[in-house]
Amino acid sequence: MVLMIVSGRSGSGKSVALRALEDMGFYCVDNLPVVLLPDLARTLADREISAAVSIDVRNMPESPEIFEQAMSNLPDAFSPQLLFLDADRNTLIRRYSDTRRLHPLSSKNLSLESAIDKESDLLEPLRSRADLIVDTSEMSVHELAEMLRTRLLGKRERELTMVFESFGFKHGIPIDADYVFDVRFLPNPHWDPKLRPMTGLDKPVAAFLDRHTEVHNFIYQTRSYLELWLPMLETNNRSYLTVAIGCTGGKHRSVYIAEQLADYFRSRGKNVQSRHRTLEKRKP
């Protein structure tokens, strides 16, 4: 297991790095006192969870010896790695100007420029010990997260989960949807008394919809649209892509089509989930 220690000057991207590591399955703690590192590692060792901890001037130990002692007391199950993020002075000044945040050392009556320089001196013991130093001056938030995934996991993007959900327009559009497709124009099994009590998960309803060319065309064109843009969506630093399919009541057409799309992308090796909002409401 890995204990990733994330350090660097304020404004260099430590919070972004921690969020990216959390997305990769790390247990993340911001500004944990260094002396507590061994206790955290021992707690997580039994659960076999890698951890990431940020260290900056706010929780920097008074002497390098305290840090070295904490490292030597880590359980053998953990392999410590020190990631140090930095950026050039002008970039840090610009980022602080953009966010209008106070530098942690500004309380010491230092100007922003002086605080940045002072912080650099205080963090030098960690910088000199770093396993990896990353200059984020020319990096966007997404590029930094992508670089960390490449370094640590050997792949460029996080694995996107596609969620296909059916819903009824009379109950409202799901607020979590990235895409909403309206299928109320397709043939409606509701008007067949035998099919009315069934759902899009039942074979007779599926057989009814499968007989209509327009249903096949809609499924084909929708999956083609999603396939066209999926590569770009997968590199957009997102964890989920939610595709909502809506019909009038959310019981027949939307359920069937959501399942058809989910099955198709699942067969292509994608991480896929499906859910049916109206049907879930009907469960006792």
From Swiss-Prot:
Signal peptide: none
Mutagenesis or variant effect for residue 281 to A: Lack of activity. Does not bind GlmY and GlmZ
GO cellular component: protein-containing complex
Binding residue positions for ATP: 8-15
UniProt note: phenotype after gene disruption: Cells lacking this gene strongly overproduce the GlmS protein.
Domain of life the protein comes from: Bacteria
UniProtKB keywords: Acetylation, ATP-binding, GTP-binding, Nucleotide-binding, RNA-binding
RNA-binding: annotated span: 266-284
Modified residues (N6-acetyllysine): 251
Keyword rRNA processing: no
GO molecular function, one term: RNA binding
Pfam families: PapZ_C, RapZ-like_N
Effect on the protein of changing residue 270 to A: Lack of activity. Does not bind GlmY and GlmZ
GO biological process, one term: protein homotetramerization
Ligand binding (GTP): 56-59
NCBIfam families attached to this UniProt entry: PRK05416.1
Role description: Modulates the synthesis of GlmS, by affecting the processing and stability of the regulatory small RNA GlmZ. When glucosamine-6-phosphate (GlcN6P) concentrations are high in the cell, RapZ binds GlmZ and targets it to cleavage by RNase E. Consequently, GlmZ is inactivated and unable to activate GlmS synthesis. Under low GlcN6P concentrations, RapZ is sequestered and inactivated by an other regulatory small RNA, GlmY, preventing GlmZ degradation and leading to synthesis of GlmS. Displays ATPase and GTPase activities in vitro. Can also hydrolyze pNPP.
Family indicated by similarity: Belongs to the RapZ-like family. RapZ subfamily.
Subunit (UniProt): Homotrimer. Interacts with the small RNAs GlmY and GlmZ. Interacts with the catalytic domain of RNase E in an RNA-independent manner.
Protein name: RNase adapter protein RapZ
The organism of origin for this protein: Escherichia coli (strain K12)
